[in-house]
Amino acid sequence: MNKKNSIDFFGASLLVIFSILLGLNQSLVKIVNLGMHPIFQVGIRSLVAAIPVIIFCLLFKKKLSISDGSLIPGIICGSLFALEFVLLFFALELTSVSRSSILFYSMPVWLGICAHFLFEEEKLNIKKIIGFLISIAAVTIAMSSKANISNGSVLGDIFALLASFLWATIILMVRMTNLKKSTPEMQLLYQLVVSAIIILPLTAYLGFGLRDITISIMFIFLFQSLIIVAAGFLIWFWVLSIYPASLMASYSFFGPIFGVFFGWLIFKEEISITIILSLLFVSVGIYLINSKNTN
């Protein structure tokens, strides 16, 4: 499929579905943390998710190559991916789903700002700047909930925010290094395989592993590994290869909304009018960010 300068209905639908899955993922990770140490969960999830991705590539004859100059940036991205999710999983151990989701999905702000300076075709115009400001306001409104503040951990907040920086860095590396020569499947495998290679030996050395594992926790773990990580991120990298990074990433502002919703649904975390307002602001912000430049 050819590159596009704006996001059409099909692309928007995929991004919204992906945002729903990511919002749900925050709650699922917190549940699985009860049965697995956070670091172990990151490593074993990467390993389990890599298997169906490899099978998919073999069945559909997707190109998997390290001879295109992508090996070094791929290893770096895989290392960043490992650190990103270790930080996020610990954040979910320390703070509420709502708060960690809101901070983690601030990623489009850092990505949009960096893309403005790094990519000539992704300059921020007045409408997009206003859109970003409105979206940031939406995140701020959601964070202003008294329940979020009282249940929050400063260290957990910092971990979630650092994880969002790493997510933006990975996206930029895909755009700016030889990783862009790799297929979306290969880009994902770099991250899954490298993170598994780094983390699993580390957890064995440190003695981190299973906690109070149950059948239901195993089912949830498999769902997030196979559906959210394997299938979801394949879609994410494919969309990244078609649509402008700053525009598609703006849809991640739906992430904290769905994260807060599932936090309320699963953990009974408080939801209020501020969440409804933040959803409205996010919708307006995304509309402005996706508006085309006019002469």
Language-model features: where?
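Transmembrane alpha-helices of multi-pass small-molecule transport proteins
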Residues: 33-83, 108-114, 166-173, 188-206, ...
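Specific alpha-helical transmembrane segments that line the substrate/conduction pathway
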Residues: 40-51, 80, 89-123, 163, ...
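Juxtamembrane helix-entry segments on the extracytoplasmic side of multipass membrane proteins
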Residues: 7-12, 34-39, 43, 66-71, ...
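Hydrophobic transmembrane alpha-helices of multi-pass small-molecule transport proteins
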Residues: 53, 75, 81, 106, ...
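Specific transmembrane alpha-helical segments of multi-pass solute transporters/efflux pumps
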Residues: 21, 25-26, 54-104, 140-141, ...
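Glycine-/small-residue-enriched transmembrane alpha-helix faces in small-molecule transporters
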Residues: 1-40, 79, 83, 87, ...
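Helix-helix packing/entry segments at the starts of transmembrane helices
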Residues: 42-44, 100-106, 174-196, 229-265
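Membrane-interface helix-cap regions at the ends of transmembrane helices
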Residues: 2, 20, 24, 35, ...
